[in-house]
């Protein structure tokens, strides 16, 4: 089984890129540090539930969308 942190990070990258956003733009819009988001996207950082909700709101998707495997429609 692939590490859930890696899958989450891949899904986050996918959703961010669909908007044409850089990590910097996502960081600015969500209020999270770019370095933290980079670690999450690489599967190196754990993410708190509160931050999943912040990212979902920022990306305009339900929080559950961030937990789906990469390659899923949103």
Residue positions per predicted region:
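Short basic helix-loop element that most often maps to the first helix and adjoining turn
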Residues: 10-29
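A detector for short, charged/polar N-terminal pre-domain segments
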Residues: 1-7
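Residues within helix-turn-helix
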Residues: 24, 35, 53
């Amino acid at each position: 089984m692939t590490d859930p942190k890696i899958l989450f990070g891949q899904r986050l990258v996918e959703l961010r890129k669909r908007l044409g956003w850089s990590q910097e733009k996502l960081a600015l819009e969500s209020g999270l540090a770019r370095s933290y988001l980079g670690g999450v996207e690489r599967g190196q950082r754990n993410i708190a539930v509160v931050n999943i909700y912040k990212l979902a709101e920022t990306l305009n998707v339900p929080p559950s969308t961030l937990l789906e495997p990469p390659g899923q429609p949103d």
